[in-house]
UniProtKB/Swiss-Prot annotation:
<dbReference type="GO" id="GO:0000710">
    <property type="term" value="P:meiotic mismatch repair"/>
</dbReference>
<comment type="function">
    <text>Involved in DNA mismatch repair (MMR), correcting insertion-deletion loops (IDLs) resulting from DNA replication, DNA damage or from recombination events between non-identical sequences during meiosis. Component of the MutLbeta heterodimer, which probably forms a ternary complex with the MutSbeta heterodimer that initially recognizes the DNA mismatches. This complex is thought to be responsible for directing the downstream MMR events, including strand discrimination, excision, and resynthesis.</text>
</comment>
<keyword id="KW-0227">DNA damage</keyword>
<dbReference type="InterPro" id="IPR014721">
    <property type="entry name" value="Ribsml_uS5_D2-typ_fold_subgr"/>
</dbReference>
<comment type="subunit">
    <text>Heterodimer of MLH1 and MLH3, called MutLbeta, which is involved in correction of a specific subset of IDLs when associated with MutSbeta. Forms a ternary complex with a SGS1-TOP3 heterodimer during meiosis.</text>
</comment>
<dbReference type="GO" id="GO:0006298">
    <property type="term" value="P:mismatch repair"/>
</dbReference>
<dbReference type="GO" id="GO:0030983">
    <property type="term" value="F:mismatched DNA binding"/>
</dbReference>
<dbReference type="GO" id="GO:0005634">
    <property type="term" value="C:nucleus"/>
</dbReference>
<keyword id="KW-0539">Nucleus</keyword>
<dbReference type="InterPro" id="IPR014790">
    <property type="entry name" value="MutL_C"/>
</dbReference>
<dbReference type="GO" id="GO:0005524">
    <property type="term" value="F:ATP binding"/>
</dbReference>
<dbReference type="InterPro" id="IPR020568">
    <property type="entry name" value="Ribosomal_Su5_D2-typ_SF"/>
</dbReference>
<dbReference type="GO" id="GO:0016887">
    <property type="term" value="F:ATP hydrolysis activity"/>
</dbReference>
<dbReference type="InterPro" id="IPR036890">
    <property type="entry name" value="HATPase_C_sf"/>
</dbReference>
<dbReference type="GO" id="GO:0032300">
    <property type="term" value="C:mismatch repair complex"/>
</dbReference>
<dbReference type="InterPro" id="IPR042120">
    <property type="entry name" value="MutL_C_dimsub"/>
</dbReference>
<dbReference type="Pfam" id="PF13589">
    <property type="entry name" value="HATPase_c_3"/>
</dbReference>
Length: 715
């Protein structure tokens, strides 16, 4: 290999750059549909052939002339801008002249287009020149794709992308191995962004199977009229794209204005198990700061958002084993800057130019919502988060009949989509006023930094299971002493006796870590609970590995799920089967499907006890955990010739066990363990400590609380 610096061949350079700009089928679909929107299309149809990494987009936009078609997909050729300052007032998605150029370098691209009142349509198979489309023209594309001729008064464009990444085989193989639901969910999120900004566009997305025999509707834009308010349109768009993931009356309107900044959106009153339905748009572009998104979600978690719904379930859970997140769409409008448009090829905003104003306003909107819903009490001492205070006089907003009361925010509970309205700024409008000093970005920034530092400290201070860690405060010197106890220490100990019918006092004799023996107090309930929990996990995984897992047939157990959830269950059906959970998905409407539960493991059947809401929650939790890699698939292939389970290291597979099984086994171990107040003989104490010393993680009970604490050094 030459050691001299040389310019890359143009072919290699183009492939590398194109792969960076267009890395997936979903991103290519997004770029083409955005081009259709820029062409003022009112109807857009998308057909996706995922197995072949191909798709087609049909629109009724203004179309292309022959001359424009011949220079289409040429790098840095665009009709959107002429000079840099044009970006400030630009209203279109595209402007770089890069998207089609990149797609054409990694796929077979075909475009056919017609301008209104032109006699002819023109087509082009890249990189060839355009030719006229006639009845006798043989189309240079797969016969699966259909092109209907336009009448003289009509216009439109058809873009067909075939065999994406055909010249990048490794990247193509990786893309083809990606689960279909992930690609479809990405497309849904991208199309939602377009429809939130352009709700009146009729956007229909379909996909075909591997044999191209059957086609399914991914989603269809419908029931959007000009008579709906913006917030009602948002609610319907969300339902159209992601299905009936949340009832419409559970979405509340929020609205806030401060000088040139305005936020309008919807927030759900009830949570869902999916965190992916949280969208913030700034001037129509997705805000992609994951740190801030996490901070916003933490505002809800800190107030136990959704706990009211959990309390309504007939089946109760100990602690908070199941995650829940709000659904929200926030549309932020502010002065547009060139810097915001140049941050990401996918047209996302990573760090907005007006971040010092936008982020505090978003936080204020969230906290106002939480306050009105009763989750949060206004903290007047924290000016960066204080809620907008309105005067006692009532006033009528110009765009509604809602009256502002003495309350911090306004909500009209008579409407299905209620409203929270506030105006911030000088002079006061409708009796609402707040000083600019309350928009304090630095406090939010510090909170985010503190949160990141806290997470880092937790990672750095985490200990492996073979050691326990505690802090002892010296009341005289006011110092902290670190004690580290390994499992090997527990192999050499002496049981002294039971203490107060609650604890077992032991003396650890191993001096390899400490220079002198230690007195350790062991929680007898936590000790027995840990022993029983590990025995239960070993038994459970042994049954799964050996195929002796007991499942019970169910009848008439159907659960309604939305289409997005149905796709998730379809993909992980075989994984659920390993745990004795058998089901079939039944296609329903465009918004909902049915999950027919066929079998459940015996332990889950007893816990479920007819509570379908609880069952849906725990099944969705595991599906989302698998999707987010919080749980790993249970690989049983290397157990096919497994004859002995004596050496089954169960802890290696604990990350595969569904959360609901963890909950059930934790509860079972807790209820059957020795309790506080139970009197134990010294021999019984010896047996307990002996079993604890053989546990994989002897330092925690089933719920994560410490099972022992060092109390003294015997010097």
């Amino acid at each position: 290999m030459s050691q001299h610096i040389r310019k890359l061949d143009s072919d290699v350079s183009e492939r590398l750059k194109s792969q960076a700009c267009t890395v997936s089928l979903a991103s290519a679909v997004r770029e083409i549909v955005q081009n259709s929107v820029d062409a003022h299309a009112t109807t857009i149809d998308v057909m996706i052939d995922l197995p072949n990494l191909s798709f087609a987009v049909y629109d009724d936009g203004i179309g292309l002339t022959r001359s424009d078609l011949n220079i289409l997909a040429t790098q840095n050729y665009t009709s959107k801008i002429r000079k840099m300052n044009d970006l400030v007032t630009m209203k279109t998605y595209g402007y770089r002249g890069d998207a089609l150029y990149s797609i054409s370098n990694v796929s077979n691209l075909f475009v056919c287009s017609k301008k209104k009142d032109y006699n002819s349509a023109w087509m082009r198979k890249f990189p060839s020149k355009s030719v006229m489309l006639s009845e006798n023209t043989i189309l240079p594309i797969d016969p699966f794709w259909k092109i209907c001729p336009w009448s003289r008064t009509k216009s439109g464009t058809v873009v067909i992308v075939e065999d994406m990444l055909y010249n990048l085989p490794v990247r193509r193989r990786i893309l083809k191995e990606e689960p279909p639901f992930k690609t479809f969910n990405t497309i849904k999120a991208d199309m939602l962004q377009i429809l939130v900004m352009h709700p009146m566009i009729s956007l229909n997305v379909q996909y075909t199977d591997k044999l191209r025999i059957n086609t399914e509707v991914l989603f269809r834009s419908k029931n959007i009229t000009e008579g709906l308010t913006k917030h009602q349109q948002m609610s319907q768009v969300l339902r159209n794209v992601f299905g009936a993931i949340i009832p419409p009356d559970m979405l509340k309107k929020v609205s806030l204005k401060f000088n040139e900044y305005q936020i309008e959106g919807i927030i759900s009153k009830m949570p869902v198990g999916l965190k992916d339905l949280q969208f913030i748009y700034i001037n129509g572009r997705r805000y992609a700061d994951s740190a801030f998104q996490g901070y916003v979600d933490s505002l809800f978690q800190a107030q136990d958002f959704g706990e009211k719904g959990m309390s309504l379930l007939k089946t109760k859970s100990v602690g908070k084993p199941y995650r829940s997140h709000p659904v929200f769409i926030l549309d932020v409008r502010c002065p547009q800057t060139i810097d915001d448009l140049l941050q990401d090829p996918a047209k996302k905003i990573v760090k907005p130019s007006h971040i010092r104003t936008i982020e505090p306003l978003i936080v204020k909107t969230i906290r106002s919502f939480l306050t009105f819903q009763g989750y949060l009490t206004p903290d007047k001492s924290d000016s960066s988060f204080e809620i907008v205070n309105c005067s006692q006089k009532t006033a009528t907003l110009p765009d509604s009949r809602i009256q502002i009361s003495k309350r911090n925010q306004v909500l009209n509970s008579k409407m299905k989509i209620a409203r929270i309205n506030s105006y911030i700024g000088k002079p006061a409008v409708n009796g609402c006023r707040i000083n600019n000093s309350t928009i304090n970005y630095e406090k939010i920034k510090n909170i985010r930094i503190d949160g990141q530092k806290s997470r880092l400290r937790n990672k750095l201070s985490s200990r492996p299971y073979d050691s326990g860690f505690t802090e002892d405060y010296d009341s005289i010197g006011k110092t902290i002493t670190d004690f580290s106890i390994s499992r090997s220490v527990l192999a050499k100990y002496e049981v002294i006796n039971q203490v107060d019918k609650k604890f077992i006092l032991i003396r650890c004799l191993d001096q390899s870590i400490h220079n002198c023996p230690l007195l350790v107090l062991v929680d007898q309930h936590a000790c027995d609970e840990r022993i029983r929990l590990e025995e239960l996990f070993y038994s459970l995984l042994t049954e799964v590995v050996t195929g002796t897992f007991v499942a019970r047939d169910l009848k008439d157990c159907c659960i309604e799920v939305d289409r997005t959830e149905a796709d998730l269950f379809k993909h992980y059906q075989s994984e659920f089967k390993k745990w004795g959970i058998g089901y079939e998905t039944i296609e329903g409407t465009m918004e909902t499907s049915l999950l027919e539960i066929k079998t459940l493991p015996e332990m889950l059947t007893s816990k479920y006890n007819g509570d379908k809401d609880y069952l849906k929650m725990v099944l969705l939790q595991h599906a989302h955990d698998l999707k987010d890699f919080k749980k790993l698939p249970m690989d049983l292939s290397h157990f096919e010739n497994y004859t002995s389970v004596d050496k089954l290291y169960w802890w290696k597979y604990s990350s595969c066990v569904p959360t609901v099984f963890h909950e059930i086994l934790n509860s079972k171990a807790c209820r059957s363990a020795v309790m506080f107040g139970d009197e134990l003989t010294r021999q019984e104490c010896i047996i307990l400590i002996s079993k604890l010393s053989r546990c994989h993680n002897p330092f925690e009970c089933a719920h994560g609380r410490p099972s022992m604490v060092p109390i003294a050094e015997l010097k």
